[in-house]
């Protein structure tokens, strides 16, 4: 889990992981609403360049409609077969973890330490670290999501 929420930060994190991970590197990432729309396609392009598999999802859409954020992000798609757009962030994390194999790494980027998501004026509890831990524990116990 990393706070990488710019193209440069995402590039640094993914480049480092590609150097040290023996398997595939996947990334779950999103772009915040009411922020620089220009960085959205760049984050997608960086993800597609440096990760083997990508899941684009929500990351504090705030007052923006998530589909508009996704439309901006889609402008950076270079290989549609290696990226899925999943509105539900928990589901995106779940899919990334389910698709990982021993030796692989899943980077969950963008929110880092933040324990919430912002949807309009509503703040919803959501912590990537806790969600990933819960899902990994279910996997360890043989549970289904």
Q: What does each model-found stretch correspond to?
A:
Residues 1-145:
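ATP-dependent carboxylate-amine ligase
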């Amino acid at each position: 889990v990393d706070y990488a929420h710019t193209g440069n930060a995402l590039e640094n994190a993914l480049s480092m992981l590609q150097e040290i991970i023996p398997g595939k590197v996947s990334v779950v990432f999103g772009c915040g609403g009411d922020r620089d729309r220009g960085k959205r396609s760049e984050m997608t392009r960086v993800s597609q360049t440096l990760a083997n598999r990508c899941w684009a999802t929500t990351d504090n859409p705030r007052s923006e409609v998530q589909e508009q954020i996704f439309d901006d992000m889609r402008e950076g798609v270079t290989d549609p077969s290696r990226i899925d757009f999943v509105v539900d962030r928990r589901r995106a994390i779940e899919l990334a973890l389910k698709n990982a194999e021993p030796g692989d790494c899943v980077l969950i980027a963008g929110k880092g330490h933040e324990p919430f998501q912002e949807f309009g004026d509503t703040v919803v509890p959501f912590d990537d670290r806790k969600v990933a831990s819960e899902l990994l524990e279910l996997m360890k116990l043989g549970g289904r999501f």
